[in-house]
Amino acid sequence: MTHRLLGAALLLIATAASAADLKVGFMPGPYRDAFAKGIAPQLEKKGYTIQYVEFSQGVQPNDAVERGQIDANIFQHTIYLEANNKSQKFDLVPIVHVPTPPMGLYSKRYKSLADVPEGATVTVPQDPVNTARALRILAAAGWVTIKPGVDPVALSERDLSANPKKLKIIPVDAAQAPRSLDDADLAAIQGNFAVAYGLRLTEALKLEDMTLPYVNVVAVKRSNKDAKFAQDIVAAYRAPEFQRLFESNAVWKGYRLPDYFTPTTTASSGKP
């Protein structure tokens, strides 16, 4: 009898230990929705209880992971993560790429690039990494020329050799870029903020050609990169059922898909 009770107690302890509270941080945008619909159900089957934590400023989710207040965050690309690690002395690492909406050039006043007049005002994200992305979109449109040999992830307006369209480039907080559409002719808006504001990627006058360093990631503390919860998150994103769910939802059309997605009826024209 004693052995049975001891065995039952050990089973209860093992069951309790297999379940865990998992705190995941997000900024405004589509990543929480994709996680809740496609990742959380897989994790819950493994015994996890998911707690969603929302942040409003870019450094906050990383600070929370560094301090152990949350386990992981999903909101940033690796270039931003590395810059944060350096400036804030964090030690966070990416564990898996996630489907990511690209930055785009939007306007409430014009329906095509051809309609945009000389001297138009363009708002761009003020942080250096995303300023560079915005300037590359303007260059791809043929509106500005970037000096040769410039660091491609640290461009600024000073690195333009020509601005034949005489654009007025105005830096703004990235999260406020969608609201700047009320005052500016155009706005370069990061995909997550565009989606959070209710814009569709198909509304953009031009989308960036998103390369892998700008595809967003799940980030954790380096000491947790091999932890079971981190491995389970990676497995959930790489699971075929997540890919099927993502590619079957028209809301996510136009996203840059991670390289581990296998070719099917792709949801992203930007997939390599």
Language-model features: where?
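Short, well-ordered beta-strand elements
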Residues: 20-29, 48-54, 121-122
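Short, polar/charged alpha-helical segment
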Residues: 29-51
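Short helix-initiation/N-cap motifs at beta->coil->alpha
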Residues: 52-63, 150-179
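Beta->alpha turn/N-cap motifs
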Residues: 56-58, 68-82, 99, 173-174, ...
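Ligand-binding "clamshell"
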Residues: 83-95, 108-110, 181-183, 188, ...
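A conserved helix-loop-strand patch within extracytoplasmic ligand-binding domains
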Residues: 95-145, 243
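A bilobed periplasmic-binding-protein/Venus flytrap-type ligand-binding module shared by bacterial periplasmic
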Residues: 102-113, 215-229
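Ligand-binding clefts/hinges and TM-proximal coupling segments of bilobed small-molecule sensing domains
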Residues: 129-144, 148-154, 234-272
